[in-house]
UniProtKB/Swiss-Prot annotation:
Name of the featured protein: Probable tRNA pseudouridine synthase B
Record Gene3D superfamilies: Pseudouridine synthase, PUA domain
InterPro entries xrefs: Dyskerin-like (IPR012960), PsdUridine_synth_cat_dom_sf (IPR020103), PsdUridine_synth_N (IPR002501), PUA (IPR002478), PUA-like_sf (IPR015947), PUA_sf (IPR036974), tRNA_PsdUridine_synth_B_fam (IPR004802), TruB_arch (IPR026326)
The PUA domain, residue ranges: 238-313
Gene that this sequence comes from: truB
EC number(s) stated in the UniProt entry for this protein: 5.4.99.25
Amino acid sequence: MKCGNREIFVKTQESTNPEWGKPPSKRTTEEYIRYSLVLIDKPRGPSSHEVAAWVKKILGVERAGHAGTLDPKVSGVLPIAVAEGTKALLALSRSDKVYVAVAKFHGDVDEEKLKAVLNEFQGVIYQKPPLRSSVKRQLRTRHVYSLELLELDGRYAVIKMHVEAGTYARKLIHDIGEVLGVGANMRELRRIAVSCYTEDETVALQDVADAYYIWRRYGDDTYLRRVLLPIEEIARHLPKIWVRDSAVDALCNGAPLAAPGVVKFETPFSKGELVAFFTLKDELIGFGRALVESEEAKKMERGLVARVDRVIMRRGTYPPMWKRKQQT
């Protein structure tokens, strides 16, 4: 997981017009809600869809969506984007996950042998979705970044697993038991991280309800702004490209980003990598794929740097200067 600590390469010094757009912290409460992300600590019991529906109802918005479905029996980090922010869920669609699982082996297990088998499962593995899965049951590869034995007590083991999106933890535990020759099943599972977002940053549904009530009843949105994150936070793990005011509306209309529109960007990024576009007021414009590597982008005076795949910002937030240039 790439979580910050990237270097910023500044191509040119540029200012931004205060009359257009606004920094996320300056949004009205209503705007802040509509472009927000909330990290819910999902309890065991309800489905991910039910939790998202509750957030939608609490905040009085027409839609809310979640990233990375958790089964009803699984608890932990569930990112939920609100209203206009749901368009930004693309940023988390392929994010890796970290789980802590309680496994029960069907026979006695030697600790050193278990550690050796866990080590064997690190890297690229093959998995077929379980029978109850909602996706097509075909063999596919998934990357297991790390498996760590936290505790072994008799036939019960606590295992921390950092895996690629779409990895079935229950199937992974089953396969580990098969290799050990004793069999195993998963008794409990908790997701402790999605990409750069950890369980330490999560809030309960009651926190969302309380924060919204305090704002509506007393006009104080301080608590609400702590519980909800600006949607810009959803791009925390992605390389960022900041653009001139004159390039913003063109991106909002789906035009690719050309080199003259780039002010600065985070490095490194590779060709084809998902990147996030930002204004000089740190507003999220949208997402796209880099058409060149960051080292090449540093030298470019003309040509295309990235394409646009998803637009978050409303058209017209910045004036359409690109149309004026086309007409002159």
